[in-house]
């Protein structure tokens, strides 16, 4: 959540003189937030996180955006598809434990992840909907729609993850309350 907050802070500072630096910082923070999100899901499901893949996203997204040799719309499509791949990975992790009953937190988290993926698909198929083009006059309504979907999706994702953690804690507390202290049965 801190990385996502820093993303929006950096985007708001893009109006200053050195807006390219703030723009790259915003995408770097956003990519770090995505990597932390995947790491938290791995840790929640008690899986070993693949650290090499988690480090790739921030580095590749900032390097991809800093390349001026390719067109801006192609850069947006490449970075959006990379982020979309990480969201599909998150959906895989959320549906990994199909034997367990899906609780409300997991369902809210899946809805948030699907909304996030929808916003990325909007950017993938209409690359005009991005701040990388720096010509927002023609793309203001789709850009606003994309940011609204992203902010609502992040709210759903954070709320769902906190609900999942609370429900897991409640299950563990109920299990410990049913165990006899002396016999551990």
Regions found by a protein language model. Name each.
Residues 174-185:
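Conserved nucleotide-binding and Mg2+-coordinating catalytic segments in signaling enzymes
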Residues 6-137, 144, 154, 160, ...:
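Juxtamembrane segments at transmembrane-helix boundaries
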Residues 1, 144-147:
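Juxtamembrane helix-loop boundaries in multi-pass membrane proteins
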């Amino acid at each position: 959540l801190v990385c996502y907050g820093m993303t929006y802070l950096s985007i708001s500072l893009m109006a200053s003189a050195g807006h390219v630096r703030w723009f790259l910082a915003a995408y770097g923070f956003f990519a770090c937030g995505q990597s932390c999100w995947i790491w938290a899901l791995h840790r929640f499901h008690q899986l070993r996180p693949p650290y090499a893949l988690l480090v790739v996203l921030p580095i590749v997204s900032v390097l991809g955006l800093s390349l001026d040799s390719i067109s801006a719309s192609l850069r947006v499509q490449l970075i959006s598809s990379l982020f979309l791949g990480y969201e599909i990975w998150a959906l895989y992790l959320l549906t990994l434990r199909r034997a367990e009953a899906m609780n409300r937190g997991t369902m809210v988290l899946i809805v948030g992840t699907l909304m996030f993926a929808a916003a990325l698909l909007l950017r993938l198929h209409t690359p005009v909907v991005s701040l990388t083009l720096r010509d927002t006059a023609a793309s203001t309504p789709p850009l606003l729609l994309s940011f609204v979907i992203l902010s609502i999706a992040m709210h759903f994702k954070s709320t769902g993850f906190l609900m999942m953690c609370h429900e897991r804690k409640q299950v563990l507390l109920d299990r410990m309350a049913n165990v006899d202290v002396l016999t551990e049965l």
